[in-house]
Every structure is written in C-alpha cells, then in structure tokens.
Amino acid sequence: MHLLPELASHHAVSIPELLVSRDERQARQHVWLKRHPVPLVSFTVVAPGPIKDCEVTRRIFNHGVTALRALAAKQGWQIQEQAALVSASGPEGMLSIAAPARDLKLATIELEHSHPLGRLWDIDVLTPEGEILSRRDYSLPPRRCLLCEQSAAVCARGKTHQLTDLLNRMEALLNDVDACNVN
C-alpha cells in the first residue's frame, strides 16, 4: 500500500481540482462502506501550498500507512481491505478496519499526537453508517499550526506564515523521523 516517492507528479492543483478530488474521495468512501460494514479510515497528508503530490508528501504518507498498520496489529484489529492512490489532493489511503469506531478514532487521534509526523496526517474515521467522527466529538482543540501555537485553520486563513517556512518544517520533521528510523 506504499507509494513510490519517485513517481510523484509535482502537479500544482487548483481550488476547483481540490474540490472535485474531495467529492471523489467521499464517493469512494461510500462505496467502501457498502462493501465493508466496518469503520473506514480515510487517510491523507496535510500539505500546504498547491503541490500535493511530491516526494515529501509520499514519504510522509508511507510513514502514516506503516503507523496505521502497526496500530491495527497492536490492537488486534483486522484490516479487511486497504488501498492507496494519488488524487489531485495528494496521496490517499483507505483502510476498512474491524474495530469499534470510537475506539479507532481515539487511537488515531493518539497516533496523530504521539508520532513525530502525526501533525502532518489527516486521519478520518467513518462509522459503518458513514458518520465522520471528529476531534470536536471528543472535546479536543483544533489542530495546531506547524510553526506556532495558533490553530492551523487560523494561520492558514490569515496566511500567517510563508509557504516555504511551512514546507521546510515538513521536510525537517520527515528527515528527523528518517534519521531516527521511526515508523
């Protein structure tokens, strides 16, 4: 289920392309939920800027896939089906996991908090009925910015930071993980 970094497109996506990609992801999620009546993990990489598919995002994605598989194995949860693809919005993974949806969401939230790359992952958990479990459902604060203590959404909306600073931080986090062989 890993993606080859050297095959990244480096395509700069437009807002309309991102919106179409989001709609296509939702359609894929509904197909998966019909095929497997268990919770679905939908996994993407948080990638600021117009280039969503590059070597860095694919490497970050691959670490996330490894971490999600390890989480399922550690918990004794069966992965019924898994797939990876690349859309206009970058690398995407889907895993149908036989586990209680709320337990799965709490475990993925912990993974996002505890893994050095977790801040760069967007891990959604959908119930078998298609409900997306949110951080708000657990009274958790919104995601923090990569560079400061503000909410990531506030900084993104206000364009508080330079894109190059955000991308450099992403790459530094990735290089630290690779240097330490963290999975």
Swiss-Prot record:
It catalyses: apo-[citrate lyase ACP] + 2'-(5''-triphospho-alpha-D-ribosyl)-3'-dephospho-CoA = holo-[citrate lyase ACP] + diphosphate. It comes from the Bacteria. GO terms for biological process: prosthetic group biosynthetic process. Transfers 2-(5''-triphosphoribosyl)-3'-dephosphocoenzyme-A on a serine residue to the apo-acyl carrier protein (gamma chain) of the citrate lyase to yield holo-acyl carrier protein. It is an enzyme of class 2 (transferase). Belongs to the CitX family. Its EC number is 2.7.7.61. It holds the Pfam family CitX. InterPro entries: CitX (IPR005551). GO terms for molecular function: holo-citrate lyase synthase activity. Keywords: Nucleotidyltransferase, Transferase. It comes from Escherichia coli O9:H4 (strain HS). This is Apo-citrate lyase phosphoribosyl-dephospho-CoA transferase. HAMAP family: CitX (MF_00398).
